[in-house]
Amino acid sequence: MATKILIFLSFVALSSAGFVWVDDDNNSFPKLRQLYVPPLPQPPPLPNIPGLPQPPPLPQPPPLFGFDFSPILPIPPIPPIPPILPTPPFINIPAPEDIKNIKPKPGQFFNGISVKSRSGYALDKDGNRVKTGGTAVLINDNGEVNETIVGDNPPKFEESRKESSSN
C-alpha cells in the first residue's frame, strides 16, 4: 500500500514540476473580464442609544466574471422580409337584387347565382318540434332570371338587402 501511495505522489510531483504557482494580476485570459457589480445600499443609521451598538455595514457582493464580447463584430440588422403572398384585390360581391336586375348588352355575357337558406325548429299545433326552413336560389343566365324556392319557410332575397343594410 505504501508503494502505491509513493508511486502516486511521484506522478503528481513530476506532472506539476514545470508549473510555477505565481499570483499575478495581469490578464492571462484577456476575454475574461471582471463585471461591474453595484454596491449594496446601506441602511440608514440607527439613532444613537447609549449601550446599544450600531450594526456593522452590510457586506458587499463579490465581483462577477464574464466574457468580454466587445472585440467581436456587431451583428448587422436583418432587413425586412417582403410579404410572400400579394394582397388580394377587393372583390365587390353583388347583392341578389343586383344579380336579378343585370341585363347584358349585345356582345356581353353574364352568369350570376345567389343562394340563401335557413333552417330551424318550431313547435306545431300539437306541441311537437318540427324542422322548418328552406332554400331560395336565384339564377341569372345571360339576362334570363329563374328563381327557385324549396321548403316550408324559405328566406326571401329582399330580406338579405335589409340584413346587409342594418349591419
Curated annotation (Swiss-Prot):
Residues 155-167 have a biased composition (Basic and acidic residues). Residues 1-17 form the signal peptide. Produced by both the posterior (PSG) and middle (MSG) sections of silk glands. Sequence repeats lie at residues 38-46, 56-64, 76-78, 79-81, 82-84. GO terms for cellular component: extracellular region. Its main location: secreted. Glycans are attached at residues 26, 146. It is found in: Secreted. Residues 145-167 are annotated as: Disordered. Keywords: Glycoprotein, Repeat, Secreted, Signal, Silk protein. Coiled coil: none annotated. It comes from the Eukaryota. This is Seroin. It comes from Galleria mellonella (Greater wax moth).
